[in-house]
Amino acid sequence: MIRNMKVLVIGAGNAGRPAARLLNHLNNRVLVNDVRELHELPLKAQKRIAEMEDEGVMFRFGGHSMEDILWADAVFISPNIPQDAPVRKMVREAGDLVHITTSDIGRTLNELIGLPMVGVAGTDGKTTTTNMIDHILSSRYRTVSFSSLQDSLVIEGLVELVVNGDIDDRDLAVFELPHGTIRMAEGLELSAGVVTNLTPDHMDEFSNYDEYIERNFSIKDLMAPGGVLALCGDDPVISSLLDDLEVENVVYGVGERRTVEFMGRRFMLSQYPGQGLRYRAEGTCRIHLHPECIRDTDSHLQHLRSPQLQET
């Protein structure tokens, strides 16, 4: 872990703040730099920044300076900072700095939390699915949930658990992984994941639809060894990705034939397995519910036959 260093965090937004707070918790001296003025940030961010200042995190707004970069031993650059931003060139010119990545932050969180985690990705239905899962599991386990319903960012919420020492009071975490947040989740290991659907949305933030799909489907890279990814087989885009999927997965659906159209591209299921559900495989799912009290639940996973995707 990164400890006892002078760390410059570039960007005071939704990626930079939780990274800075975690690094400060690990006994680093942390300075957060942002090109914007404080009053230009959302009120919620301003409130969080005030709390972080009370914890010892330093902030400087209104621009970036070489003096701040040279002060640091290490730097974390928010993934939201454009690749051609002048500050990235300044960092390169500064020379020998330790570069802290989003993956470093995720792995550190993963190690400090030590809880089984369930993540929900996709375009529509993430909040509903997250809260349904939390509602079911909370009847038996001490869960913590982060979603739009709670108006909470998952990485900020997980860092809060670590900083406040609330981990021992929880058995597992359930959270929503929107397209913006999922980049900061790299390094986490999920016991289970869900992808609801992959229809076009927020396309002004992506160069093309394929980039949007890749970002949201990157939840597959967060699965822990033995973890299971649940995927909606009714979605033709998800169905097109099943053959190359290397993680343990279960495909669910109700047999609805759906079509996705975007910018001249049309995705549809060319065939579907009959009425209702047909099953293609049987497996065993082991759910690790707490490091100190592991409960292995064996259940037969019934998978849908992989429908064939046709793009016209």
From Swiss-Prot:
InterPro entries per the record?
Mur-like_cat_sf, Mur_ligase_cen, MurD
Pfam families noted in UniProt: Mur_ligase_M (PF08245)
Annotated Gene Ontology MF terms?
ATP binding; UDP-N-acetylmuramoylalanine-D-glutamate ligase activity
Q: Which GO terms describe its biological process?
A: biosynthetic process; cell division; regulation of cell shape
Task: Kindly indicate whether the keyword Lipid biosynthesis belongs to this entry.
Answer: no
Taxonomically, the superkingdom here is Archaea
Entries under Gene3D superfamilies matching the protein:
Mur-like, catalytic domain, NAD(P)-binding Rossmann-like Domain
The residues that the entry says bind ATP are 112-118
What is the annotated signal peptide range for this record? none
Q: Which family does it belong to?
A: Belongs to the MurCDEF family.
This chain's protein is named Uncharacterized protein MTH_531
